[in-house]
Regions:
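Conserved aromatic beta-strand anchor motif in extracellular beta-sandwich/beta-rich domains
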Residues: 167, 203-205
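Short tryptophan-centered beta-strand motifs in secreted/extracellular beta-sheet-rich domains
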Residues: 118-120, 186-196, 201-203
Length: 251
């Protein structure tokens, strides 16, 4: 009897050690309330630039404070982890990732690791309120207040309903390509960023390639990490429940 597709898609490639495959794989559907704390210990804090942790039963995240937050952690709702549940103020937000060290999981080395991917499924209450809503991979480096200040990046960015591809190479200016695909208020979509072993990046929106795309290749030897960067515009984005987050080697 063949292996069911819903099981087979999680099986590791024979060419990759099982322990290493499992170590690089992250899946979270945000059903349980996390424990929050400051990186390094103590209570979570909300000053611009602060870094905190969110610990779920099976996964761990870090979040970097953008602006100033009096609500110190995002909360779980019936839909998922609501990244919009902190302060509703223009230029306030957060970046969600798994830590900024190349030793932290999951990070990937272009040209050394096998092909890898990130998948995020989420909803946006008010798309006109997203100053930036970025999902993708960036260089493993210190968290930045401005997403355009990362040295290298390949991501999808939802701005005022437009789904854009945004890329950065070697600290140069951000290159923005409008996919011409759109996101309406309260809609739920799935974004996927795929990186080949050679660093070639492709994108999917709800399982299909964008209408308009842009070529990009990460530099060989670069360490990259998955991230979600969310920042309020003056109109405010409201609830942004993250329903699924999955990252690892491509099957």
């Amino acid at each position: 009897m063949p292996t069911p597709a819903n099981i087979a898609k999680y099986q590791y490639k024979d060419s990759i050690n099982r322990r290493y495959w499992d170590e690089k794989f992250i899946y979270e559907n945000f059903k349980e309330n996390p424990v929050s704390a400051a990186v390094g210990g103590g209570a979570a804090t909300g000053t611009a630039g602060d870094e905190n942790v969110l610990m779920f039963p099976a996964t761990g995240f870090e979040y970097h404070i953008l602006g100033t937050q009096t609500i110190l952690a995002p909360k779980i709702t019936a839909e998922g982890l609501d990244l919009g549940s902190m302060d509703a103020t223009a230029d306030d937000g957060l970046e969600l990732n798994h830590g900024i060290l190349s030793s932290q999981i999951p990070s990937f080395t272009v040209g050394t690791d096998a092909a890898f991917y990130l998948r995020a499924r989420f909803s946006i209450a008010d798309v006109s309120g997203t100053d930036d809503c970025v999902v993708g991979f960036r260089k493993v480096e210190a968290n930045q207040a401005n997403v355009d200040d990362y040295a290298d990046m390949a991501a999808l960015n939802v701005i005022s309903g437009d789904i854009n591809i945004e890329t950065i190479v070697g600290g140069a200016a951000t290159v923005t390509t409008d996919t011409t695909d759109n996101w309406a208020d309260t809609e739920t979509h799935e974004l996927r960023i795929l990186v080949s072993a050679a660093g070639v990046v492709t994108y999917q929106i709800d399982g299909a390639a964008p209408t308009t795309t842009a070529a990009y290749t990460f530099t060989d030897g670069l360490n990259v990490m998955p991230f979600f960067y969310l920042l309020n515009d003056t109109d405010l984005h409201g609830s942004v429940p993250l329903m699924e987050w999955e990252c690892g080697y491509q099957a």
